[in-house]
């Protein structure tokens, strides 16, 4: 599952890949029988009729269907490459849960079993239970792996989107960053590399929020309001792409906007690729915009150089055969000569240096945040901060 979906995600210039969609439950059809839907006349809980999967292997359901006698389907929460997430009622525990129903295709089933194995490892300590989503149960139903999770709040991306991409306050970014780094440090201790860190895979524990007046005012001098989470508690989700060893790997991983240079250059990757993603995420939470909004490898590298300076020669000279075409004379990036459009050149030119972009959102006196980002976004993985080193950074020791 590691490389699944990356090609299609990169085809169009969009801010990010297609997002999970959140649906309202349609009105329940009138029952033709005077019995509770999903129950027989004798009160027994009935299974839904056998239905063919859709052409993509997704489980076909109706709201208020039973998913085994234990779970009742209430609404569709989201959909992704892997399958669908449904909100369900757990009749045994009397609580709402989120059930991830995997497509009935072998590669997705295999990835789901890897995720289950990872989730079982993560809950063996308090760190895993408090920082990573908890799996409550799993089962195989009509050739679909179903993973039952605690029901959490919206993702950080969804929260940003609903707030019209208004940046989070720096104090909240600090809180999120600390928790995220603790989660990843714990995973790395277990020799696990997440490989797909992004705001969509970081969920607020609670859906509650507070509305506060914004500093911005309209032309009519009206006060604008913004929403902030009532609690800053977050949990990491989606371990279907997690790698369970400490070897150097050469496959394509990470969602485009959070992909590290060693992956693009084909140099091999390990734990450090997660830290690059965290650097991109923290920038996005602080500014409301993805740092590298691109769909093309050469443009992506050009954006990196624009924001962070030239790529190290010792890395460009070792680029894989597939990445050699992005360079002239072995080390200089073939830009803008190799650009595939004028719009691509303009997109790169719109970027400023990282510290200048940060300073537009963070007071210049708070340079510790920019310094942390430079440490997380070091080109050379061996020079990049580890999760534990990042947690010791002065940014997390201050309250201003």
From Swiss-Prot:
Q: Which SUPFAM superfamilies match?
A: Protein kinase-like (PK-like)
Keywords assigned by UniProt, alphabetized:
ATP-binding, Kinase, Nucleotide-binding, Serine/threonine-protein kinase, Transferase
Q: What is its EC number?
A: 2.7.12.1
Q: What name does UniProt use for this protein?
A: Serine/threonine-protein kinase AFC3
Supply the CDD domains for this chain.
PKc_CLK
Kindly indicate whether the keyword Hydrolase belongs to this entry.
Answer: no
Q: Which domain of life is it from?
A: Eukaryota
Nucleotide-binding keyword on record: yes
Q: Which family does it belong to?
A: Belongs to the protein kinase superfamily. CMGC Ser/Thr protein kinase family. Lammer subfamily.
Catalytic reaction list: L-seryl-[protein] + ATP = O-phospho-L-seryl-[protein] + ADP + H(+); L-threonyl-[protein] + ATP = O-phospho-L-threonyl-[protein] + ADP + H(+); L-tyrosyl-[protein] + ATP = O-phospho-L-tyrosyl-[protein] + ADP + H(+)
Which residue ranges does the record assign to the Protein kinase domain? 71-396
Q: What is the lineage of its organism?
A: Eukaryota, Viridiplantae, Streptophyta, Embryophyta, Tracheophyta
EC class, as a word, reads: transferase
Q: Which residues form the active site?
A: 196 (proton acceptor)
> Which Gene3D superfamilies does this one have?
Phosphorylase Kinase, domain 1, Transferase(Phosphotransferase) domain 1
Protein's GO biological process: protein autophosphorylation
Q: What are this entry's molecular-function GO terms?
A: ATP binding; protein serine kinase activity; protein serine/threonine kinase activity; protein serine/threonine/tyrosine kinase activity; protein tyrosine kinase activity
Mention any Pfam family matching this sequence.
Answer: Pkinase
Region listing for Disordered, in residue ranges: 1-29
Which residues are recorded as binding ATP? 77-85, 100
